Amino acid sequence: MALISLAIDYKKSPIEVRSEFALSGLDVSMLYRSILAIDNVVHAVILSTCNRTEVYLEISDLRVVDDILVWWQGYVRNPNYKIKDYFKLRQGTEVIMHLMKLACGLESMVLGEPQILGQVKDSYTLSKKNHAIGKELDRVFQKVFATAKRVRSETRIGYCPVSVAFSAITLAKRQLDNISSKNVLIIGAGQTGELLFRHVTALAPKQIMLANRTIEKAQKITSVFRNASAHYLSELPQLIKKADIIIAAVNVLEYIVTCKYVGDKPRVFIDISIPQALDPKLGELEQNVYYCVDDINAVIEDNKDKRKYESSKAQKIIVKSLEEYLEKEKAIISNSAIKELFQKADGLVDLSLEKSLAKIRNGKDAEEIIKRFAYEIKKKVLHYPVVGMKEASKQGRSDCLVCMKRMFGLNVEK
């Protein structure tokens, strides 16, 4: 079984590309059913966030990568975008190292941001819920979570309050000096939307409107702030008229706010959704200011230096953690092989022993039967090692011969 991952992320792909290849907003159960239906795909975990879409897989044949790319391409709306031009393939320990760094926030656009760990955990949970994760992949994710917890507790990588959500609010503050007199509309009440809400409430705006597909979730979040209100997405046309700042963090497959919704009133539009929820053409209107996820980079760069030192400490923890994981995996593999070896030996002994005991019970010479039993066991136990040594000798594999000699306590010098 081999461990691989296929990824499209912000490092190689701009927002319009990431939007096309995003798997968020699609039926999760359908996604897992379809990917597990591919021959040689054994287990899978699908992660899709604003900055990346990644698929982690246990496969039985590396040639299946082409089939997975075809599967992924099938969800792309614009045929001009070809996944082979953008994806990155990782294999084996590279996958585990990347996932550890990712969960710790070292691969994020915002260095050390904590939200990604929650997103990785959510993806893991959904995979389990859809019976798509196996023992090996499960062990990988458990070690990843333990590593991320250790990094958070032993470093200050997440000390600065910097996230995509925080950076979005920073951009809004740059455009509008006095947010306390402004109305803010947040679209989406997921993890990022809730984080946005918390950052906005700290600025004490005149009013916060939170729109979501299900109003119950929005009501739960807004109940803690007296100037906040919860709304359905269907109310967006009316809400936009009131809003000075519109921030979107929602999973949709097409634009839900376009130029037809806005008049001459100056507004700040910030879209951190993938795929994009706010039409970029909003920024072409003279009175508007428009930012997308990629525009947040400038804000993020200001905070990177503060975290670089903590990042190096986190890297050391990750390297150590990976070494621990690999050592444990070696033990699991060897223990499994040892168990199988004993089961094989038990099978050989049990069969010959039963035959020998039956002969003794029938009055045959016990001494002769025991000698014969010992000879048969010796012959059966040594059959495969002898065949293997002969084959290794034919192929000139002296390393295999030395290894087998050591296994049986023979003199390796001869």
From Swiss-Prot:
Record comment regarding domains: Possesses an unusual extended V-shaped dimeric structure with each monomer consisting of three distinct domains arranged along a curved 'spinal' alpha-helix. The N-terminal catalytic domain specifically recognizes the glutamate moiety of the substrate. The second domain is the NADPH-binding domain, and the third C-terminal domain is responsible for dimerization.
Organism lineage string: Bacteria, Pseudomonadati, Pseudomonadota, Gammaproteobacteria, Thiotrichales
Known function: Catalyzes the NADPH-dependent reduction of glutamyl-tRNA(Glu) to glutamate 1-semialdehyde (GSA).
Known EC number: 1.2.1.70
Protein name: Glutamyl-tRNA reductase
A GO term, aspect molecular function: glutamyl-tRNA reductase activity
Family: Belongs to the glutamyl-tRNA reductase family.
Name of the encoding gene: hemA
Assembly: Homodimer.
Matches recorded under Gene3D superfamilies: Glutamyl-tRNA reductase, N-terminal domain, NAD(P)-binding Rossmann-like Domain
Pathway info: Porphyrin-containing compound metabolism; protoporphyrin-IX biosynthesis; 5-aminolevulinate from L-glutamyl-tRNA(Glu): step 1/2
Catalytic reaction list: (S)-4-amino-5-oxopentanoate + tRNA(Glu) + NADP(+) = L-glutamyl-tRNA(Glu) + NADPH + H(+)
Biological process per Gene Ontology, one example term: protoporphyrinogen IX biosynthetic process from glutamate
Residues that bind NADP(+): G188, A189, G190, Q191, T192, G193
Active site location: C50 (nucleophile)
Miscellaneous comment in the UniProt entry for this protein: During catalysis, the active site Cys acts as a nucleophile attacking the alpha-carbonyl group of tRNA-bound glutamate with the formation of a thioester intermediate between enzyme and glutamate, and the concomitant release of tRNA(Glu). The thioester intermediate is finally reduced by direct hydride transfer from NADPH, to form the product GSA.
SUPFAM superfamilies per UniProt: Glutamyl tRNA-reductase catalytic, N-terminal domain (SSF69742), Glutamyl tRNA-reductase dimerization domain (SSF69075), NAD(P)-binding Rossmann-fold domains (SSF51735)
HAMAP family named in the record: Glu_tRNA_reductase
Binding positions (substrate): T49, C50, N51, R52, S108, E113, P114, Q115, Q119
InterPro entries: 4pyrrol_synth_GluRdtase (IPR000343), 4pyrrol_synth_GluRdtase_dimer (IPR015896), 4pyrrol_synth_GluRdtase_N (IPR015895), GluRdtase_CS (IPR018214), GluRdtase_dimer_dom_sf (IPR036453), GluRdtase_N_sf (IPR036343), NAD(P)-bd_dom_sf (IPR036291), Shikm_DH/Glu-tRNA_Rdtase (IPR006151)
Site positions (Important for activity): H98
